[in-house]
């Protein structure tokens, strides 16, 4: 019984240290492997975390919170949300059977203070969901390997840090 209590305490401490990872994707066992290293440094069966309905739902929640414009198909977050359940199921099946194809990004130009324009690519909502699902799986694996002085596009860091 003491061993089970100690394991539970350790799992809770690990969960706190890795609070920024997506809990729908990363189990306590996987977080422990992140901390102690994976035997041989090789991860197996990560694609099932990306393609799972649970992982896609978590990614959808992140995309919803970020909002943003529609992609080349002009579908908005609200439009996708009206049929999110069936759309996520379909996306999961497409990813699993290899028929998923991302759409081209919509190109827009944002004016800069100097009068020039900055190009910006806007992916379709469904493609943003897949990107978020992939990020949720890969980011915790690679985050610890990045240089501590690197701040761009990293969780909990920014250009102003």
Segments the model singles out, each with a brief description of its role:
Residues 2-4, 8-13, 17-19, 24-161:
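Conserved pre-catalytic core of RNA-dependent polymerases
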